[in-house]
Regions:
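General beta-strand structural signal in soluble alpha/beta enzymes
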Residues: 80-83, 183, 209-212, 233-236, ...
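Rossmann-like adenosine-cofactor binding region
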Residues: 314-384, 389-391
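Flexible, glycine/charged-enriched surface loops at secondary-structure junctions
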Residues: 39-44, 81-83, 184, 211, ...
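Glycine/serine-rich phosphate-binding loop and adjoining beta1-alpha1 elements at the start
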Residues: 80-263
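Adenosine-phosphate binding glycine-rich loop
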Residues: 232, 236-237, 256, 365-474
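Glycine-rich phosphate/diphosphate-binding loop of Rossmann-like nucleotide-binding domains
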Residues: 152, 159-177, 229, 235, ...
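A conserved regulatory-domain signal marking ACT and ACT-like small-molecule sensing domains
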Residues: 1-92
Length: 476
């Protein structure tokens, strides 16, 4: 599918052009004829003979941006100056910082913020460790932990290259939920080492957000940390995705008039996200689900599963899905299905496959940047279509969930996170979309809807209290 110009590949080009003539119209024509989009044009200096103009341009890729620059370079009378990649400019020096809540202006301030006054606070915590939540940043802090092994669609790029993503995650925590999140990029991909490191740093945090850790190690790491720690551990790639998918599916079913217990769901992808989505859907009431991976439909008799370990994710899928014992390919499995959910690879389905689904079909094609099926083609026969992309309606985006989930967990001083809390989060997110707003192109709210984080946080907080998972200490 063609890729439209995006702000992700936005650049500002400084040009000098003749003050008279058609140079300005020529450069806008050159950009648009090259497939780019002029999003801003600012005159930064003017004279009788020359104009200096900063042109902001959206391209579809770095190669496309280079092509546009070369087109501009070829315009007669135009002198090309500095070309700035706006995304890289935003990352210069990092995107986040630590800031003090109290000014340190004199010796009195210094004596209370640091020595000697701080010693009294330290001793108070030593006598009552629970006071760390009340007297330190712990109560509002989340560690965003990665080993860089499964970063976005980039793969195993390592901890340093993963840092910009973790910084971005921390910025989103602050923007949408007021949470102080700290990027922790570990230079090891050893499961035991990661578990021990996170256990060692846990005293400084009220929650752990695991991020971009490859499957199947992510399952073991999360399970062991949940067992060992008295703070919630949440692998967002699994559970954040699952919560948003369930919320979107809830509203898609409202659009189509189908009941969750009566639908047949076919999923493509049995990795971290796929497994978590499946578990949450089953907990929400789905009775009939089939999963396919690169080897085809997952079923108990499949050759590669006969000797699979009982505790493995794929074995669990085989034991808990595909009640009809289907075999074969994804394309065969999707025939007559009510719902398709893809968390796998581009273009595994086509328009004919979607047309072969049940009436009122729901298609969630979430692979990025290229979905499992072209959304424009899927819309020709499906009743509701969602993707992971921001340039189509119904974007399934984890930003809708993780800030509110952790806000609720931290406010409740929860010691864990469980399925009931995630179900509550999904229901709250779905309910942000009112009956008057609901339609096939609006089943999930915008990340900038100011009701989202509060609604999710409130639901998670109440679910944590109901589960008896909260600490007994009070906060001022």
């Amino acid at each position: 599918m063609a890729t439209a110009p995006s702000v992700s590949y936005s650049m500002t080009v400084r040009l000098e052009v003749p003050a008279s003539g058609t140079a300005v119209s020529q450069l806008t024509t050159a950009v648009e004829s090259s497939g780019g989009s002029v999003t801003g044009l600012d005159v930064t200096a003017s004279g009788h003979e020359k104009l200096r103009i900063d042109v902001t341009i959206a391209a579809s890729s770095t190669a496309h941006a280079d092509e546009i620059v070369e087109e501009l370079r070829g315009i007669e009378g135009v002198t090309l100056g500095k070309v700035s990649d706006r995304t890289f400019l935003m990352h210069l020096g990092g995107k986040i910082e630590m800031a003090s809540k109290h000014p340190i202006r004199n010796r009195d301030d210094l004596s209370m913020v640091y020595t000697p006054g701080v010693a009294r606070v330290c001793m108070a915590i030593a006598e009552n460790p629970e006071d760390a939540r009340r007297l330190t940043i712990k109560r509002n802090s989340v560690a965003v932990v990665t080993d860089g092994s499964a970063v976005l669609g980039l793969g195993n790029i390592g901890p340093k290259a993963a840092l910009p993503v973790m910084e971005g995650k921390a910025a989103l925590f602050k923007r949408f939920a007021g949470i102080d999140a700290w990027p922790i990029c570990l230079d090891t991909q050893d499961t035991d080492a990661i578990v021990e490191i996170v256990k060692a740093i846990a005293p400084g945090f009220a929650g752990i957000n695991l991020e971009d850790i490859s499957a199947p190690r992510c399952f073991e790491i999360e399970a062991r940390l949940r067992e060992a720690l008295d703070i919630p551990v949440f692998h967002d790639d699994q559970h954040g995705t699952a919560i948003v998918v369930l919320a979107a599916l809830t509203n898609a079913l409202r659009v189509t008039g189908k009941a969750i217990e009566n639908i047949r769901v076919v999923m493509s992808g049995a990795g971290a996200a796929g497994t978590a989505i499946l578990k949450l859907l089953l907990a929400a009431g789905v009775k009939n689900a089939v999963v396919a991976d690169i080897h085809g439909v997952v079923h108990a008799g499949r050759e590669d599963l006969v000797d699979a370990a009982p505790g493995s994710a794929l074995r669990w899928i085989a034991d808990n899905t595909n009640l009809e014992g289907l075999t074969g390919t994804l394309k065969e499995a999707v025939r007559g299905a009510d719902v398709f959910i893809g968390v796998s690879a581009p273009n595994v389905l086509d328009g004919d496959d979607v047309a072969a689904m049940a009436d009122g079909a729901i298609v969630f094609a979430l692979a990025n940047p290229d979905p499992e099926v072209d959304p424009a083609i899927a819309r020709q026969t499906a009743a509701v279509v969602a993707t992971g992309r921001s340039d189509f309606p119904n974007q399934i985006n984890n930003v809708l969930v993780f800030p509110g989930v952790f806000r609720g967990l931290l406010d409740a001083q929860s010691r864990t996170v469980n399925t009931e809390m995630m179900l509550a989060a999904a229901t709250a997110l779905a309910d942000v979309v009112t009956e008057d707003e609901l339609n096939p192109n609006y089943i999930i709210p915008s990340v900038f809807n100011d009701k989202v984080a509060g609604a999710v946080a409130g639901a998670v907080r109440e679910a944590a209290k109901a589960a008896g998972a909260t600490a007994t200490t009070s906060q001022p």
